[in-house]
Amino acid sequence: MLPLSISTSPDPASQFPTVPDLPTLTPTPSPTSGTAKMNEFTISNLCPEASDRLSLEVSPSSTGLLEPKSSTVSPAPSCTGYPIFDLTGISKQSSSGVSSTRTSSLEPKSSAVSPAPSSPEASNPNKRPAYSYNALIAMAIQNSPFKALRLSEIYAYISNNFPYYKMENGGWQNSIRHNLSLREEFYKVQTTDGKGSFWAMNTQLGSDVYIGKDCGSLRRKKNGKPRKYSKRSNTVSNPNPIPQIPSFTPSPLLATPFPLFLYISQAYAQNPNLLPMMLQNFQHFNFQNIPALSFPFPFSNSNGNPNSRN
């Protein structure tokens, strides 16, 4: 048996020369660095003229960094003269829809439109409001976006703004319908599809209509001679955001045209090429010699002449 000789190979790392450690370098700030140069510039160096007119004073009170902030913030004065609205009473609503409470709290409310918080209607809902039915109707219509409301929307406005009518029976709704029908200030606007109607105010009255402060009823101004207004009708004669578009129905005159036009239409139906020639001759036609025809036109009459008059 021959003895086995195991030779160990040298370490691979020992084959490379060792690198001496490099000395650590610590950077020393240079007095001529860019930061030091920028710190040397002041406003007086850049613009000597401005230093005479501007005085920059930095104090702890002006910055507010060293003073503790107060827990209560006093409201700032209004610059434009409009009242500052209190936003603390706004209820939080979801971002998906717009809340009517948020919109109404940002806009000033008129005391003639809805009861104020200090009014008897708000403190005592069981007390009847001091407004007549026609005044309540005028409030509802004038506060609508299009100045026209359906009957159910008028009911909803009155019951929401005056809780007294929400607790009452439906007798007051009959009074609302009677005032809409009998008062000259209101008129009905039919919808274009004929499936409903809106109630609007007569715009011919203009600013003559107002709500009396003493009686709470709808009043008119009396300036000299009384003005004459046209009778209220179902048709819309005044400009309105929801106008009534009348449907066009052919009249009997259009259904039975002038005989000459009837002959032209019949000839065109038989031969369209004859129409230019007939129109050319039609320009030289004397309309003054045409006798007045009765209505309806007797196109066919078995008892006599078809052109005879009744």
UniProtKB/Swiss-Prot annotation:
Q: Does the UniProt entry include the keyword NAD?
A: no
Composition-biased stretches, type Basic residues, lie in 218-231
The annotated consequence of gene deletion is: RNAi-mediated knockdown in adults has little or no phenotypic effect on adult or their progeny. However, simultaneous knockdown of forkhead gene fkh-2 in adults causes 8% embryonic lethality, and nearly 80% arrest after hatching as L1 stage larvae.
**Pfam families to which the protein is assigned, alphabetical:** Forkhead (PF00250)
A single cellular component GO annotation: nucleus
User: InterPro entries, alphabetically?
Assistant: Fork_head_dom, FOX_domain-containing, TF_fork_head_CS_2, WH-like_DNA-bd_sf, WH_DNA-bd_sf
Q: Which PROSITE patterns match?
A: FORK_HEAD_2 (PS00658), FORK_HEAD_3 (PS50039)
Predominant location of this chain?
nucleus
Q: Name one GO molecular function term.
A: RNA polymerase II cis-regulatory region sequence-specific DNA binding
> Which residues lie within the region annotated Disordered?
1-37, 58-77, 92-126, 217-242
Q: Which residue numbers delimit the DNA-binding region?
A: 128-220
Feature: compositional bias, Low complexity = 17-35
GO biological process: any one? regulation of transcription by RNA polymerase II
Compartments annotated for it: namely: Nucleus; Cytoplasm
Biased-composition ranges, Polar residues, are: 1-16
**What's the domain of life for this entry?**
Eukaryota
Q: Which key words tag this protein in UniProt? A: Cytoplasm, DNA-binding, Nucleus, Transcription, Transcription regulation
Query: What does this gene product do?
Result: Transcription factor. Plays a role in embryogenesis and later development, perhaps acting redundantly with forkhead protein fkh-2.
Q: Which PANTHER family match?
A: FORKHEAD BOX PROTEIN (PTHR11829), FORKHEAD BOX PROTEIN PES-1 (PTHR11829:SF398)
Stated name of the protein: Forkhead box protein pes-1
